[in-house]
């Protein structure tokens, strides 16, 4: 099983390779997309952490 950082870097690299092909996407759109992906992953990890702590009775 690959690590999370490896998977995340693979996703970001694939996005960076695909985005320049699309003509309608400008630099600002690409930055907004990458920022949204990073914030979404961070939010999901935070929710999973809260769930795990509640399940173990630490909260």
UniProtKB/Swiss-Prot annotation:
Extracellular membrane side: 25-29
Name of encoding gene: SMIM30
Name used for this protein in its record: Small integral membrane protein 30
Cytoplasmic side: 51-59
GO cellular component, one term: mitochondrial membrane
Transmembrane feature ranges: 30-50
Record's keyword terms, sorted: Endoplasmic reticulum, Immunity, Innate immunity, Membrane, Mitochondrion, Signal, Transmembrane, Transmembrane helix
Signal sequence annotation: 1-24
Subunit structure, as described in the record: Interacts (via transmembrane domain) with antiviral protein MAVS (via transmembrane domain); the interaction disrupts MAVS interaction with RIGI and inhibits MAVS aggregation, resulting in the repression of type I interferon signaling and innate immune responses.
Function comment: Negatively regulates antiviral innate immune responses. Disrupts the interaction of antiviral protein MAVS with innate immune receptor RIGI and inhibits MAVS aggregation, resulting in the repression of type I interferon signaling and innate immune responses.
Membrane-protein topology: Single-pass type I membrane protein
């Amino acid at each position: 099983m690959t690590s999370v950082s490896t998977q995340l870097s693979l996703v970001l690299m694939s996005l960076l390779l695909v985005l320049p092909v699309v003509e309608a996407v400008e630099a600002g759109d690409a930055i907004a997309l990458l920022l949204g992906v990073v914030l979404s992953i961070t939010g999901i990890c935070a929710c999973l952490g809260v769930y795990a702590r509640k399940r173990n009775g630490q909260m």
